[in-house]
Regions:
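Long, low-complexity, intrinsically disordered polar/charged segments
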Residues: 1-2, 107-112, 144
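Solvent-exposed, acidic/flexible segments
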Residues: 45-46, 56-64, 87-94, 103-107, ...
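Extracytoplasmic/secreted envelope proteins and their assembly/folding machinery
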Residues: 64-71, 94-98, 111, 128, ...
Length: 220
């Protein structure tokens, strides 16, 4: 009986993978659904999209051009939010850098530059002093940067990040959450569709995101 049960489960899994499609994603295959959906900040018929990422994450760096192009294509259909996943806990320097740039109104200008510094220029931005030195060397006023870096607002948001990540069940990067409940990542898309080519994976991930935004919009 145990052997038969195992065979049936295996057959079901194979069938699930065989029917997987990025343009028609299936729950438990390309994406999962949060048991406790999170509140969203979208207004009207717009769909909120949240990306959990880390600057040192190679997969995030590879995903960034695809995600940026996808955001541009979606336009007014979505509200995009990025949340740094604090791998080092409530004092994570990379997350603090992101929050500091956001507080200064410099995030759009510097977000991609941080990725470039880490993955192209091979800068190690994992310690406070290294980050502060990099910021000063890259055109940011050191005094203003430190003011934001040490501000109550940044410190408060930084301390809340682990709880936010736990609420979204985000433990790896990149992870994208659509409408506070649909969770997808390039890794799950690759696994469910047996994709090994990076170009194909980026295309497929974009298709899954498209489908889930459409699905979410239908309930608005």
């Amino acid at each position: 009986m145990r052997t038969l049960r195992f065979a049936l489960v295996a057959a079901a899994l194979v069938a699930g993978f065989a029917n997987a499609s990025p343009t028609d994603p299936r729950v438990g295959s390309e994406y999962t659904v949060l048991a406790a959906p999170q509140p969203t900040q979208a207004i009207g018929k717009k769909v909120e999209v949240v990306e959990f990422f880390a600057y040192h994450c190679g997969a995030c760096n590879a995903f960034e051009p695809t995600l940026n192009a996808w955001i541009k294509k979606q336009g007014d259909n979505i509200v995009m939010r990025r949340i740094p996943l604090p791998f080092q806990g409530p004092s994570d320097p990379e997350a603090r850098l992101f929050l500091t740039l956001d507080a200064m109104g410099k995030l759009e200008q510097y977000h991609d530059r941080v990725f470039r510094a880490v993955h192209v220029e091979r800068k190690r931005l994992m310690k406070d002093d290294d980050i502060i030195a990099w910021a000063a060397a890259n055109g940011l006023d050191k005094a203003k940067f430190l003011e934001a870096w040490n501000s109550f607002g940044v410190q408060t948001k930084l301390k809340r990040l682990p709880a936010v990540a736990e609420a979204y069940k985000a433990s790896s990067t990149p992870t994208v959450v659509i409408d506070g409940k649909y969770v997808v990542s390039p890794a799950t898309v690759a696994q469910s569709n047996k994709i090994q080519d990076m170009g194909q994976l980026m295309t497929a991930t974009g298709q899954v995101l498209d489908a889930l935004v459409t699905k979410a919009a239908q309930t608005k």
